[in-house]
């Protein structure tokens, strides 16, 4: 099953993969991941390359290169056992392929290894993964609007994602969170996001670490009555994040989304009979006045 699950996910997502490969980030990343394969197998690129094969064929893998590639395959399969989305599967393949390419190029020629590392650094500095721009029902907060919105109507339950655009885990979770917002958003249950990589004071206020080594991104916090009710991942006594998988099933189960949704629907119906002097639940919107998804 550890092997079949990633393969099934990839086959199921072939149409989406074709759209990804049309984007510069994924196209260039795929080329870098296959760089050694192209150099070693395609003439005239392979002509004149050193080889340890007994037949002296420079356009085929020697036994050590095969061992490295087999080890890469094993690592990718083990890492993909914990991957949830196709983006995570592809990201793991790209990352470990580049590591293997670096080793293979340095083993072939130190100059080729240095050139490959330089290309990877330039790629990382100039190309960023495309942000999720699909349908969603999410309100984007900034450092001022998040507290105002949470306090505006305390009958509204909020689920807020604290994210950073540079985090691969946040990028992988984006389509899952968007899909949840489309399924469960209603008058009394709203979904929000705030970029703590951009608004560092928000990360400090809500105790979400933005360190590059952190395991706290993304963080989901449930607010009820304007106060934090729970969060995932949890933080232990030493201030470290407890490992938690951000899958759609886990979010629905841990945050009791089905129950929250039914309760919010009942409250919204009862709200029709609320006297005028009581505050009325705010109308959900996709973005706030001060924040827009495209600004990121």
Swiss-Prot record:
Which cellular component terms (GO) are annotated to the entry?
endoplasmic reticulum membrane; mitochondria-associated endoplasmic reticulum membrane contact site; mitochondrial membrane; mitochondrion
Kindly identify the disorder that the protein's record connects it with. Neurodevelopmental disorder with microcephaly, cortical malformations, and spasticity: An autosomal recessive neurodevelopmental disorder characterized by developmental delay, severe to profound intellectual disability, congenital microcephaly, cortical polymicrogyria, lissencephaly, reduced central white matter volume, and drug-resistant epilepsy, lack of speech, absent ambulation and a progressive neurodegenerative course in most patients. Early death may occur in some patients.
Subunit annotation: Monomer. Homodimer; disulfide-linked. Occurs in both reduced and oxidized monomeric form. Oxidative conditions increase homodimerization. Interacts with CANX. Interacts with ATP2A2.
Q: Which residues lie on this side of the membrane: Cytoplasmic?
A: 126-296
Q: What does this protein do?
A: Endoplasmic reticulum and mitochondria-associated protein that probably functions as a regulator of cellular redox state and thereby regulates protein post-translational modification, protein folding and mitochondrial activity. Indirectly regulates neuronal proliferation, migration, and organization in the developing brain.
- What sections of the protein cross the membrane? 103-125
Q: What is this protein called?
A: Thioredoxin-related transmembrane protein 2
Q: Where is the Thioredoxin domain?
A: 114-269
- Tell me which residues bear Phosphoserine: 211, 243, 288
Database matches in Pfam families: Thioredoxin
UniProt main location, coarse: endoplasmic reticulum
Give one GO biological process term. Answer: brain development
**Gene symbol?**
TMX2
Q: Where in the cell is it found?
A: Endoplasmic reticulum membrane; Mitochondrion membrane
Q: What is the effect of changing residue 56 to R?
A: In NEDMCMS; uncertain significance
Extracellular side stretches: 49-102
Q: Which UniProt keywords apply?
A: Disease variant, Disulfide bond, Endoplasmic reticulum, Intellectual disability, Lissencephaly, Membrane, Mitochondrion, Neurodegeneration, Phosphoprotein, Signal, Transmembrane, Transmembrane helix
InterPro entries, sorted: Thioredoxin-like_sf (IPR036249), Thioredoxin_domain (IPR013766), TMX2 (IPR039101), TMX2_thioredoxin_dom (IPR037463)
Question: What, per the annotation, is the impact of changing residue 231 to W?
Answer: In NEDMCMS; increased homodimerization; even in absence of oxidative stress
The protein's superkingdom reads: Eukaryota
- Name any one GO molecular function: disulfide oxidoreductase activity
- Describe tissue expression: Widely expressed.
| Sequence motif Di-lysine motif, residues | 293-296
Q: Does the keyword Endoplasmic reticulum apply?
A: yes
Q: What is known of its domains?
A: The thioredoxin domain lacks the 2 redox-active cysteines, suggesting that it lacks thioredoxin activity. The di-lysine motif confers endoplasmic reticulum localization for type I membrane proteins.
């Amino acid at each position: 099953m550890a092997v079949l699950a990633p393969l099934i996910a990839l086959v199921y997502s072939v149409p989406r993969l074709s759209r990804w490969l049309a984007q510069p980030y994924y196209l260039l990343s795929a080329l870098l991941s296959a760089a050694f394969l192209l150099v070693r197998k395609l003439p005239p690129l392979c002509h004149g390359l050193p080889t340890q094969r007994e037949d002296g064929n420079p356009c085929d893998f020697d036994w050590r290169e095969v061992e490295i590639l087999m080890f890469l395959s094993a690592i990718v399969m083990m890492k993909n056992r914990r991957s949830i989305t196709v983006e995570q599967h592809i990201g793991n393949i790209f990352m470990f392929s580049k590591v293997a390419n670096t080793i293979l190029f340095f083993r072939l020629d130190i100059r080729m290894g240095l050139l490959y590392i330089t290309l990877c650094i330039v790629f990382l500095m100039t190309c960023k993964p495309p942000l999720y721009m699909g349908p969603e029902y999410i309100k984007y907060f900034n450092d001022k609007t998040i507290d105002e919105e949470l306090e505006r109507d305390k009958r509204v339950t909020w689920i807020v994602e604290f994210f950073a655009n540079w985090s691969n885990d946040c990028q992988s979770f984006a389509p899952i969170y968007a899909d949840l917002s489309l399924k469960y958003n209603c008058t009394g249950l709203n979904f929000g996001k705030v970029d703590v990589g951009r608004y560092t004071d928000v990360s400090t206020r809500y105790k979400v670490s933005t360190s590059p080594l952190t395991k706290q991104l993304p963080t989901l916090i449930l607010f009820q009555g304007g106060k934090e009710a729970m969060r995932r991942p949890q933080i232990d006594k030493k201030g470290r994040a407890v490992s938690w998988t951000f899958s759609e099933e886990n979010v629905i189960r841990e945050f009791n989304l089905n129950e929250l949704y039914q309760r919010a629907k009942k409250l919204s119906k009862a709200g029709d009979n609320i006297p005028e002097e009581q505050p009325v639940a705010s109308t959900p919107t996709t973005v706030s006045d001060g924040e827009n998804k495209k600004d990121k």
